[in-house]
Amino acid sequence: MSIELFHVISDAGSAEVRRFVVDHELESAVRFRNLHYPEVQADFARHQGSVPPAVWDGERLFQGAQACIARLSALSDVGRAS
């Protein structure tokens, strides 16, 4: 599964999600996509993105810091004992 995090460097919500990825050691599972770049903006628009940060999981776009963290939490819970 390829997870993409669309983010803005200067945005507080984006920083919160980037920190979550690092704190939960998800760097190998999440591709950071900086919305500063036109090609990243085009991909974001193709997924109907309008609010950073946003996580694309290959099927659905999750927008806003809390929605992103909720989606990424599912990745960090994989393999843990119940």
Predicted regions located by residue number:
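N-terminal leader/targeting and pre-domain segments
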Residues: M1-S2, R80-S82
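Secondary-structure boundary motif
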Residues: D23-L26, R46, A74
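Short glycine/proline-enriched coil/turn segments at helix->beta-strand junctions
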Residues: L26-E27, G49-S50, G58-E59
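Local sequence-structure signature of Cys/Sec-based thiol-disulfide redox active-site neighborhoods
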Residues: M1-R31, Y37
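Alpha-helical elements of the RecA-like P-loop NTPase motor core of helicases
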Residues: A15, A42, A70
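Thioredoxin-like thiol-disulfide oxidoreductase module
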Residues: R31-S50, V78
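Non-catalytic, surface beta->alpha helical segment in thiol-disulfide oxidoreductase systems
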Residues: W56-A81
